[in-house]
Design a protein with these regions (language model features):
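Extended, compositionally simple hydrophobic/Ser/Thr-rich segments
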Residues: 3, 9-13, 18-150
Length: 150
């Protein structure tokens, strides 16, 4: 569905499966309370767009930029996320085994990781980690912060 007119509206869509979701220009996609069982999904939120989803997935590719917000709950084997320019990833309630996170220019990610984590942080970004993953091949530059929660 491609809605291009700028108006406040609710659109209800029913579909058997998802491959990707994209929200932009302050739009919001709520894909719950349903739990989506997926092998792979791509999520993209830009320019204030917001996506909320609950899922069980093997692979999640997430991208947010320019104040985009991704809120993900459920379970995933692998999470790959790229966040730029004040984007946010709220995934404390996404139980993830492996994660690869790239943050820059004030982006913030809150994640739960159990096994392996790699990250690259630039430009005053912040990563909040829940869990006790093995951290591999990671970089922290330009005033970025890492916070470990118990």
């Amino acid at each position: 569905v491609n809605i291009v007119k700028y108006a406040s509206m609710n659109v209800l869509i029913s579909m058997p499966t998802l491959g990707s979701l994209k929200a932009s220009n302050h739009s919001r996609i709520d894909a719950w309370p349903q739990i989506w069982n997926l092998r792979t999904i791509r999520l993209e939120a830009t320019t204030g767009g917001q996506i909320r989803i609950r899922l069980k997935a093997e692979d999640i590719q997430a991208e947010a930029r320019t104040s985009g917000i991704l809120e993900i709950k459920g379970e995933a084997q692998n999470l790959q996320a790229i966040l730029k320019t004040a984007a946010r990833l709220e995934a404390r309630e996404l139980e993830t085994q492996n994660a690869d996170i790239q943050l820059s220019i004030g982006a913030k990610a809150e994640i739960q990781v159990n096994q392996r984590l790699t990250y690259d942080l630039y430009g005053h970004s912040r990563l909040v980690i829940k869990g006790n993953p093995q951290i591999e091949n990671s970089h922290n530059y330009s005033g970025s912060r890492i916070i470990k929660e118990k």
